[in-house]
Amino acid sequence: MIHILFIMVGGGIGAVIRAWLTDVFKSKITSPIPIATLIVNLVGSFLIGFVYGIAQDYQLFSLFFITGVLGGLTTFSTLSYEIVQFISPSFKPVQFFSYSILQFVIGFISCFIGYSI
């Protein structure tokens, strides 16, 4: 039961941080792609790799911070929604491919770099 509580509290914290950062980035940066989600996901991916690399043996901390906080911070559902917007109602190939590549490839590389540090 304590595991669920750690994940729930961490997830709430991460979601609030994501909402706040999204508002900050949207008010300060104009971009043809959803830059707020990109930044949040890339930073989150890096931090997931970094924390996983140093905290594998600390189950409660990993559940709270990786699964909870960073899971709440990063967002696959918003990413999916934003990618669908590039193909509907009219296909925007440059935004679609650049955003997809940045999110998935650079996201993986960010996580790997974080883990390798």
UniProtKB/Swiss-Prot annotation:
Protein name: Fluoride-specific ion channel FluC 1
Activity modulation comment: Na(+) is not transported, but it plays an essential structural role and its presence is essential for fluoride channel function.
Record family assignment: Belongs to the fluoride channel Fluc/FEX (TC 1.A.43) family.
Main location: membrane
Transmembrane segments: 1-21, 35-55, 60-80, 97-117
Places the protein is found: Cell membrane
InterPro entries: FluC
Keyword Transmembrane on entry: yes
GO molecular function: fluoride channel activity; metal ion binding
GO cellular component: plasma membrane
Keywords for this protein: Cell membrane, Ion channel, Ion transport, Membrane, Metal-binding, Sodium, Transmembrane, Transmembrane helix, Transport
Membrane topology: Multi-pass membrane protein
Catalytic activity: fluoride(in) = fluoride(out)
Residues the record lists as binding Na(+): G71, T74
Gene Ontology terms describing biological process: cellular detoxification of fluoride
Function (record text): Fluoride-specific ion channel. Important for reducing fluoride concentration in the cell, thus reducing its toxicity.
Superkingdom assignment: Bacteria
Keyword Cell membrane among UniProt keywords: yes
